[in-house]
Amino acid sequence: MERIVENLAEVEERIARALARSRRHRSEITLIAVTKTFPASATLAAWQAGLRDFGENYVQEFETKSPLLGPLEDARFHLIGHLQSNKVNKAVPLFDCVQTVDSARLAGRLSQSRAGAGLPPLDVMLEVKLSDEESKHGCDPENLAVLVEGVRPLPHLRLLGLMTIPPFFEDPERSRPYFARLRELAVKYELKALSMGMSNDFEAAIEEGATHIRLGTALFGRRTKPAG
């Protein structure tokens, strides 16, 4: 708990400096604590430290972890990993936001499942693939217009904006063009939310207009358990 409090204070200082450079306000940034592969105790400690938004990559992992958390007041859980179609029905009651919608088919299934569960509209973001990495998921920019128009009318989804994961660079400045490109696409399609920036490059993301940053290592330290 003490380490998370200290790390969060350092992160907040870095956020404040990036916001000052870009003449923005703290209220414009949602800090998502990425708790994938960490135990439920880490999520609870982060919540006690004042964090309210949490990111998970794997539906099955969070399905196991969720009952251990109990009711956390004001907590919001974001799915930030690839969502397979066969996991939609499990994901829908677990998450408040799915940031990795990359096809109209997936969006349709989410909307249908949300309706069937009798839940209010699900917040979603569209994941955009801006690199050539085969390991990355997302909609290609040239197909984004069709996806946006396919998702907007769905009655049980609420389209917030765009999300991307650039290649990892030691130099965070190399991520900046990817962030700038996502911002341009958001402006083009009149979308307000931009989920971009992780522990290594979130300051550059904030300077380029991020509204949601996803931080794991900066808050919790390096993971010792392999992802998967």
Predicted regions: what they are:
Residues M1-N200, I206-E208, F220-R223:
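Conserved alpha/beta-domain cores
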